[in-house]
Curated annotation (Swiss-Prot):
It comes from the Bacteria. Gene3D superfamilies: 1.10.1740.110, alpha/beta hydrolase. This is Homoserine O-acetyltransferase. The gene is metXA. Substrate binds at R212, D341. It is an enzyme of class 2 (transferase). The keyword Manganese does not apply. The active site is at S145 (nucleophile), D307, H340. SUPFAM superfamilies: alpha/beta-Hydrolases (SSF53474). It catalyses: L-homoserine + acetyl-CoA = O-acetyl-L-homoserine + CoA. Pathway: Amino-acid biosynthesis; L-methionine biosynthesis via de novo pathway; O-acetyl-L-homoserine from L-homoserine: step 1/1. Its EC number is 2.3.1.31.
Length: 368
């Protein structure tokens, strides 16, 4: 079964953390496996910033998913055992309501009139979807990068129906360097003349492509770039004297930027990167305790030592904080020349798969 959509919050609007409301909300999602009669074998998979709900192939000739190596019969997320749900995030642009969606009040796209939202709001939409699908309990919420932030919020807001969390390469709060990179990327978009205050036709390609290129530099490592590109050049025809020599790394980054603008919306990029910046579960909640102190379920945290976006010292600090507050946390570190994106790379599956499989297999019996 490929992408499905369900309209939510039709009778009662979605109440966002900032007090704004929205109705209705369309959610795009994909499912794998079958929901059990007891409706308690669900795994919720969270995608990263520019991911989609298409986590794995549904059939042989289907388009590849972003986590094919982990999903399917007999694999880590065994679809003969689990009912897997993956949604496109609220505010995105691949099937779920976001800035490019039509505002029912105006008949025009929301664009920058779309309300601001948080990671907490993203999972609130997911919670409503799972309820509509008949899910009563979740074995685990799994996510990497921004997906790990969503998983952590699930442990805080919906621990009553969630049995465990797997967070890959995501801190308990976005660090200043990640916030800085996100600002640079947003400024590239905002300063593109074609952005037109968010009222663009097509995409502000130059700004969005530049944002993607900046992002790619944080998703990989200098070790990988040196090994792959060194100072190799490629043949390029350019009238500008300063660009007669074109390096392979330049060609690679330009390709990444050019292909990205074909599949992603600039306004969604602005909103989602800001939601990442604002994520901070170390901040005091209403009871003046850090929000993460509410986590009481098994929590697997995997840090990547070479991560250039969410630095390993932030993951280690998160682990120490979780331990201090008696969260049942298990922590592992993975070294990879692929850096932040290592959990998405086929070659690196042997480093992550045993950690995830072991964690799932050793959950309390009630969670299996």
């Amino acid at each position: 079964m490929t992408l499905q959509q369900k309209e939510l919050f039709q009778k009662s609007p979605l109440l966002l953390e900032n007090g704004e409301t929205l109705s209705p909300v369309l959610v795009g999602y994909e499912t794998y496996g079958t929901l059990s009669a007891s409706r308690d074998n669900c795994i919720l998979l969270e995608h990263a910033l520019t991911g989609t709900a298409h986590a794995a192939k549904h059939f042989e000739d289907d388009a590849p998913g972003w986590w094919d190596d982990y999903i399917g019969p007999g694999k880590t997320i065994d679809t003969d055992k689990y009912f897997l749900v993956c949604t496109n995030v609220f505010g995105g642009c691949s099937g779920t309501t976001g800035p490019s969606s039509i505002n029912p009040k105006t008949g025009e796209p929301f664009r920058l009139q779309f309300p601001g939202f948080s990671i907490k709001d993203i999972i609130k939409v997911q919670r409503e979807l799972l309820e509509q699908l008949g899910v009563t309990r979740i074995v685990s919420v799994i996510g990497g990068s921004m997906g790990g932030m969503q998983a952590t919020e699930w442990a805080i807001d919906y621990a009553d129906i969630t049995d465990s969390i797997i967070n890959i390469a995501s801190p308990l709060a976005a660090g200043p360097d990640a916030i800085g990179y996100n600002l640079i990327m947003r400024m590239a978009i905002l300063n593109d003349p074609d952005f037109n205050g968010g009222n663009y036709i097509g995409q502000p390609e130059g700004g969005l492509a530049t944002a993607r290129m900046v992002g790619m530099m944080t998703y990989r490592t200098s070790e990988l770039f040196s090994k792959r590109f060194e100072r190799f050049t490629v043949a390029e025809s350019s009238p500008a004297a300063f660009s007669k020599e074109h390096f392979q790394i330049e060609s690679y980054l330009q390709y990444q930027g050019d292909t990205f603008v074909e599949r992603f919306d600039a306004n969604s990029y602005l909103y989602l990167t800001k939601a990442i910046d604002l994520f901070d579960v170390t901040a005091p909640a209403k009871d003046d305790l850090p929000a993460f102190s509410k986590i009481k379920i098994p929590y697997l945290l995997i840090g990547i030592t070479t991560d250039q976006l969410f630095r390993i010292h932030d993951l280690r600090r998160g682990y120490e904080l979780l331990k201090e507050w008696d969260v049942p946390v298990t922590y592992h570190e993975v070294a990879s020349e692929y850096g932040h994106d290592a959990f998405l790379v086929e070659k690196e599956v042997p480093k992550f798969e045993p950690l995830i499989r072991s964690f799932l297999n050793n959950l309390p019996v009630k969670s299996i």
